[in-house]
């Protein structure tokens, strides 16, 4: 081992090393960014054609109109997707741009480095030296060698060459000779194949891929400081930060202290206690995340801010704090929902979902919440004039003018916008509900079934479509191999749920549906909640405006009504446990609730009929050996029968004689 190391004075190594490390970072980031630019929007929206465009535009424009300037300012600050400028000058884009600039500089430096070119020319390639291909025959090799020897042999060089030119020609001839021997002489060829050179092992040098001034010069202490900072400070800092975050937060993204508070509340929860929105908000006010955001505020302050938001009250100087904690409630309530399902507590789970609806729409949980979530509604006027109207379905039994009177909306333009929002809030109608087992016609003991729901997403303005009008083929599950292998794949092909109308929520909200399954026997939740984020809202488009429940019509004769134009959505819920081991009927409660709207949710009872598998008929397989044995058996049986026939005849005759004797 040499005691002295050579430094990379000619910059032969370190540019390539840095270039490789840089490309390992910049390359994948660039590909990911290109994918998001060209395919990210389509993957996020998920819809196509009118089934997407109308719903997105309706709520986009109305959200923009009814969102306050304070919330818009908050969104520009915290919502990265709300600012186009932030998309262009995002941190990732800046890193990519700077990275490719550095790549270009390094490539230019490498290409203009003569030392790298000289190192490349030192590589011995006999085929290149002789000017032949790697598939050349021995005859071609000898022919090329003769031609080059005539040109570069020292005895045949021109007399007018300078000493330098003559030296180059002689060196070239030596290389030609070595190349020829590397391909024809067996010993020299072995050296070339083993060491890469016909002369055998070449001298090697050990160096440091850094310039001398960084190690031996005045910059040496700086390099040591950089190494110490990288290995002793920066790397441990990021690793410890990652580890602390991993240990401090649950899989649902909530702090362990918050999760511990939720668990403690559920442990101490009394079944006789009524679950209300106020109770859930009280639990939320102790979230550790809120304390991290605003250390100077207390849980009572957080609870007051949440109450201000739900009742649409101004919080003065604490408005920004209110927006911040309200925006965080999304992950907190999903974490509470998951913990409640772990405790199998259906009341708390439903309370968490209803509370989130209240927070999204900024409406308290009352019998009138379906109406109060609409824009432009005069709350005091409506409560005094409401009568028995509490739902959107009941509201759309009135004429538009009467609806304006009930809601206290006098301006026709505002009334039209209110009706537009009301008619595009999704309602679910169950068409078909089954327990299915892939590849089976029925649920068998200990099998793995799942719940398949066929639903019609409709508007409260539209009349109910009789199930008898829906063709059976529109409800039938596909039976191909891929569907049997992964029955949930078809759900991923449905479009994403559009953005919700939520002008009071601090961030843009894309709606979803939460599915809960509980036992009808004891009311306990059986598994974790299933969140549905893909479901077609095509039936809410403008082309269905003619379909108004206030207009009497015969659907079978209406010229614009075509059942095939109506989208049937599919919701599949995997069960977290196998079917019971015994045969019988088992009843389950299935709940599908919107997380963003007060609307018509699904709450149905399903019967799981567990039956034994039908008996399989055994098919006898023909065998020549069995046939031989059966022939012998037949002969034996015939012999036995012939022997037994004598006794039979005697018995018969005797009986005949006995019968005749009395006569």
From Swiss-Prot:
Comp. bias (Acidic residues): 622-663
Chain intervals for the UniProt region annotation (2 X 11 AA repeats): 461-503
Annotated ranges, domain SEC63: 228-532
Any Gene Ontology CC annotation: rough endoplasmic reticulum membrane
GO aspect biological process, one term: post-translational protein targeting to membrane, translocation
Main localization, broad class: endoplasmic reticulum
Modified residues (Phosphoserine): 512
Membrane disposition: Multi-pass membrane protein
Membrane-spanning intervals of the chain: 14-41, 93-108, 221-239
Parts of the chain on the Lumenal side: 1-13, 109-220
SUPFAM superfamilies: Chaperone J-domain, E set domains, Sec63 N-terminal domain-like
Domain J: 123-198
Subunit structure: Component of the heterotetrameric Sec62/63complex composed of SEC62, SEC63, SEC66 and SEC72. The Sec62/63 complex associates with the Sec61 complex to form the Sec complex. SEC63 interacts in its phosphorylated form with SEC62. May physically associate with KAR2 in the endoplasmic reticulum and this interaction may be regulated by ATP hydrolysis. Part of a complex consisting of KAR2, SEC63, SEC66 and SEC72.
Protein known as: Protein translocation protein SEC63
